[in-house]
């Protein structure tokens, strides 16, 4: 089966670091692009999961916790957005997946990248890791995957 046409091509998405009229969508995009997080993982991030001093984020998925290293640029971006219990919340409750996808879609459209999605941004994360000579096992661990099976197509 043929993968998407974007597979294998590393995109220049440096414009994502520029200011945006959709700051939440921008931060969602950066968390996926920089750390390979899933929208569901992003929506469950509590402010207490972020350790700004150590630039790490604790992510929980299916009862498994993992620690994600944050870049100093991303840590700075996160520090500007924290206020309540969750990173993205309304009245103390996390926003819905639909909200996250609308924010991401609006941001990607603003940056002229309407053809991208959460999945294609996660793929960009994987491609960047491979470019940096990281092993599939390390990438799988960082993504919270139990095995490298879903990453085999990148060999």
Residue ranges and their predicted role:
Residues 71-114:
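Active-site/catalytic core of tyrosine-dependent DNA strand-transfer enzymes
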Residues 15-20, 48-51, 145:
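Solenoid-like repeat scaffolds
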Residues 35, 44-76:
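Conserved tyrosine-mediated DNA breakage-rejoining catalytic core shared by Y-recombinases
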Residues 28-29, 40-45, 139:
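Alpha-helix N-cap/helix-start motif at helix boundaries, enriched for small hydrophobics
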Residues 55-59, 128, 137-155:
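Short functional hotspots where side chains directly engage DNA or cofactors
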Residues 2, 6-39:
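Basic, Lys/Arg- and aromatic-enriched nucleic-acid-binding interface segment
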Residues 102-141, 145:
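Short, basic (Lys/Arg/His-rich) helix/loop patches that form interaction surfaces
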Residues 49, 94-98, 145-153:
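Short, basic interhelical loop/turn and adjoining N-cap
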């Amino acid at each position: 089966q043929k993968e998407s046409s974007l597979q294998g091509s590393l995109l220049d998405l440096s414009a994502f670091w520029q200011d945006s009229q959709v700051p939440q969508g921008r931060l969602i995009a950066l968390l996926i692009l920089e750390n390979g997080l899933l929208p569901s993982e992003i929506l469950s991030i509590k402010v207490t999961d972020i350790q700004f001093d150590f630039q790490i984020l604790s992510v929980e998925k299916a009862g498994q916790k993992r620690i994600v290293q944050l870049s100093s640029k991303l840590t700075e971006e996160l520090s500007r957005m924290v206020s309540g219990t969750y990173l993205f919340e309304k009245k103390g409750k996390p926003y819905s997946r639909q909200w996250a996808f609308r924010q991401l879609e609006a941001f990607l459209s603003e940056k002229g990248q309407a053809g991208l999605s959460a999945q294609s941004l996660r793929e960009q994360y994987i491609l960047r890791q491979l470019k940096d000579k990281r092993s599939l096992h390390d990438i799988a661990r960082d993504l919270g995957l139990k095995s490298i099976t879903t990453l085999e197509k990148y060999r």
